[in-house]
Amino acid sequence: MSCQIFEKLEAVIRQRIAEGNPQSYTYRLYSSGVSTIARKVGEEAVEVAVAALAEGRERVVEESADLLYHLLVLLNSLGLSLGDVCKELERRMK
């Protein structure tokens, strides 16, 4: 299964950061720095776990979407992309 939405989402994240609009959640999150973004990724990961244990499949999907979005912002803030993660996964499969 190909999930091209990640490429689109990465492009939107880059665009929102480049625009520098303080009304944009993405821009504000990015501007808050790696430490804050990393904490947010941790919070979202916990929310996925809680949803898996107590809230049902729909909530797991919703919280997973939040986690993936925040992870993409974190990767961007470190000068990385999902492509870098994909390369590592491909390397591990060899």
UniProtKB/Swiss-Prot annotation:
It catalyses: 1-(5-phospho-beta-D-ribosyl)-ATP + H2O = 1-(5-phospho-beta-D-ribosyl)-5'-AMP + diphosphate + H(+). One of its GO terms (biological process) is L-histidine biosynthetic process. It is an enzyme of class 3 (hydrolase). InterPro entries: HisE, PRib-ATP_PPHydrolase-like. Keywords: Amino-acid biosynthesis, ATP-binding, Cytoplasm, Histidine biosynthesis, Hydrolase, Nucleotide-binding. It is found in: Cytoplasm. Pathway: Amino-acid biosynthesis; L-histidine biosynthesis; L-histidine from 5-phospho-alpha-D-ribose 1-diphosphate: step 2/9. The keyword Phosphoprotein does not apply. One of its GO terms (molecular function) is ATP binding. One of its GO terms (cellular component) is cytoplasm. Pfam families: PRA-PH. The keyword Translocase does not apply. Its EC number is 3.6.1.31. Belongs to the PRA-PH family. This is Phosphoribosyl-ATP pyrophosphatase. It comes from Pyrobaculum aerophilum (strain ATCC 51768 / DSM 7523 / JCM 9630 / CIP 104966 / NBRC 100827 / IM2).
